[in-house]
Swiss-Prot record:
Protein name stated in the entry: Peptidyl-prolyl cis-trans isomerase cyp8
Comp. bias regions, Low complexity: 206-222
Gene Ontology biological-process entries: protein folding; protein ubiquitination
Chemical reaction(s) catalysed: [protein]-peptidylproline (omega=180) = [protein]-peptidylproline (omega=0); S-ubiquitinyl-[E2 ubiquitin-conjugating enzyme]-L-cysteine + [acceptor protein]-L-lysine = [E2 ubiquitin-conjugating enzyme]-L-cysteine + N(6)-ubiquitinyl-[acceptor protein]-L-lysine
Gene source species: Schizosaccharomyces pombe (strain 972 / ATCC 24843) (Fission yeast)
Coiled coil (residue ranges): 433-461
Domain PPIase cyclophilin-type residue range list: 274-428
Major localisation: nucleus
Enzyme Commission designation: 2.3.2.27, 5.2.1.8
Keyword Transferase in annotation: yes
Gene that encodes it: cyp8
Keyword Hydrolase: no
Xref: CDD domains: cyclophilin_RING, RING-Ubox_PPIL2
PROSITE patterns, sorted: CSA_PPIASE_1, CSA_PPIASE_2, U_BOX
Family assignment from sequence similarity: Belongs to the cyclophilin-type PPIase family. PPIL2 subfamily.
Length: 516
């Protein structure tokens, strides 16, 4: 029911669409949709879209400054050498360092009037000095009186040195949506180029692999790589469960056991039973040692591989304590250096019956629990207090007289030998890991031979007939046109007679009259 206050015409508020949508505001809505933008604040980096800490800028041909942060623009210029916003060529020399003043409230402001900068402020900077001012300040104190000196440090400049940081009437270079669109366009171009390169490489690989020479070489390389067996873990890869719970994962419907790396499988203390043997060559003589691969595989593997690489060559024994031990294995000779073959410390190995109870025991030196590197020591006598603190991985089996000579070398107060004890080289006589690999290859070879013999038996029937021959004949016919009649070969045509046989003439006469 109408009220007496209702107007009989459309008011301005109703026509403008303040309280809702109607047909009369379609033109305004279209205008707003075309002119809407998201302005990037002046104190934000155009590359990272985050507030800058070390502001700088690149200037385009219209003297509009594009603001960046040094932390993000420098790596970009080193890698691409272009302006990330407009794609123009740029270098480190084109960067201009900007200097913004701050007031007591820690807000960016004009250094002369101390007026805070906002999104509606017209901000300019001097190219030669990098100082940022309000346009009103520059116009009133520099342009109109023609006083071409910086208002902060009195450095002279020209009108061309004035660059625009932010113009509230021209915010195209600070349009957030335009910057995002340019980044997405550049990303799409990279993806397109990568797809084209991938297709070209695939086409090239298919052409190259189609050649018989390359296919033969690939087959030979596969056979060499497959000499060692593939070891599987007791757990699965987990791909089936991951594909079930994640929509972004490629569907997998089969559980497969995970593959164990050869080194991880080999360094299990139950795998290798071979002992290793090596010789330590010093300037006082040679010492033969035995390596306990079955008790400390990681320590032995580390020692053997470092020795093969020449890591211990021409080093010194930096610590020598009579009736206790002699220590070496540090290339720096200080006792604070050296690293393992893996580049990081490895764990201790105490799950064995070995004890520090005899002369000639070889153990790993460390700085604490699970800090083994490259240093080792040889005992001059029993040291039970070292049990379960240092990993035992070998013992001296020859050259104890050389060990006696090393023990007699005089030392200083820091236990450093007064005369250098040089470790000239370590020679590996028996590498237990190479022996294990040979055994594994032989086992794999015997296994394949047995499988081939079983397959040969499967291809022979109980009557002794070779089923592979019939299968090959069938495979030859399994092609296009196998149901068409086979053409007669030339040999068949030559041996086929084309002369028709002579017809026998019927005999005439009286014949025999016995039936009469």
């Amino acid at each position: 029911m109408g009220k007496n206050t209702d107007k009989l015409y459309i008011t301005q508020t109703e026509h403008s669409g303040v309280h809702g949508w109607h047909g009369g505001m379609s033109g305004i809505a279209q205008k707003n949709s075309t002119t809407s933008y998201k302005q990037l604040p002046f104190n934000y980096c155009s590359l990272s879209l985050q507030p800058f800490n070390h502001p700088c800028c690149l200037v385009d041909e219209t003297k509009q400054a594009i603001i960046f942060d040094f932390r993000f623009i420098v790596p970009w210029l080193r890698k691409h050498g272009t302006n990330p916003i407009n794609g123009q060529k740029a270098s480190m020399s084109d960067l201009i360092k900007l200097k913004f003043a701050k007031n007591s409230a820690e807000e960016y402001c004009d250094p002369v009037t101390m007026k805070s900068f906002t999104r509606f402020s017209h901000i300019v900077a001097i190219r030669s000095t990098g100082n940022c001012f309000s346009w009103d300040t520059i116009e009133r104190l520099n342009i109109k009186p023609k006083h071409w000196r910086d208002l902060v440090n009195e450095e002279q400049f020209t009108r061309d040195d004035i660059i625009t940081i932010q113009d509230p009437h021209n915010v195209e270079n600070r349009d957030f949506s335009a910057i995002q669109k340019q980044k997405e366009t550049a990303r799409d171009e990279k993806i397109t180029k990568a797809k084209i390169a991938l297709q070209a490489s695939r086409a090239k690989s298919t052409e190259s692999t189609s050649s018989p020479e390359l296919s033969h070489s690939l087959d030979s390389s596969k056979s060499i790589a497959s000499d060692m067996p593939i070891h599987r873990a007791s757990h699965t890869t987990g791909y089936a469960a991951a594909s079930l719970t994640s929509t972004s994962f490629t569907p997998v419907t089969k559980n497969e056991r995970a593959i164990i790396a050869e080194e991880d499988y080999m360094l299990n203390h139950t795998r290798i039973k071979h002992k290793g043997y090596a010789r330590i060559v010093t300037n006082h003589g040679e010492i033969n040692i035995e390596l306990h691969t079955d008790y400390a595989p990681h320590a032995v593997y580390n020692f053997v591989q470092l020795a093969k690489q020449g890591y211990y060559r021409n080093t010194i024994f930096h610590r020598n304590i009579a009736r206790f031990m002699i220590q070496g294995g540090d290339p720096s000779g200080t006792g604070r250096g050296g690293q393992s073959i893996w580049g990081k410390p490895f764990k201790d190995e105490f799950c064995n019956p070995l004890k520090h109870d005899d002369r000639g025991i070889i153990s790993m030196a460390n700085r604490g629990k699970n800090t083994n590197g490259s240093q080792f020591f040889i005992l001059y006598g029993p040291a039970k207090h070292l049990d379960n603190k240092h990993t035992i991985f070998g013992r001296v089996v020859g050259g104890l007289n050389v060990l006696d000579a090393l023990e007699k070398v005089p030392t200083n107060s820091n236990d450093h030998p007064k005369l250098p004890i040089k470790l000239e080289d370590i020679i590996i006589f028996v590498d237990p890991f190479e022996e294990w690999k040979k055994d594994e290859r032989e086992k794999e070879k015997r296994k394949r031979q047995e499988e081939e013999e079983e397959n040969n038996l499967d291809r022979t029937s109980w009557t002794g007939r070779d089923l592979s021959a019939s299968s090959t004949d069938h495979s030859l016919n399994a092609s296009v046109g196998k149901y068409l009649k086979k053409e007669v070969s030339l040999e068949e045509k030559t041996f086929t007679s084309t002369v028709n046989p002579k017809k026998k003439k019927a005999r005439t006469g009286f014949g025999n009259f016995d039936a009469w």
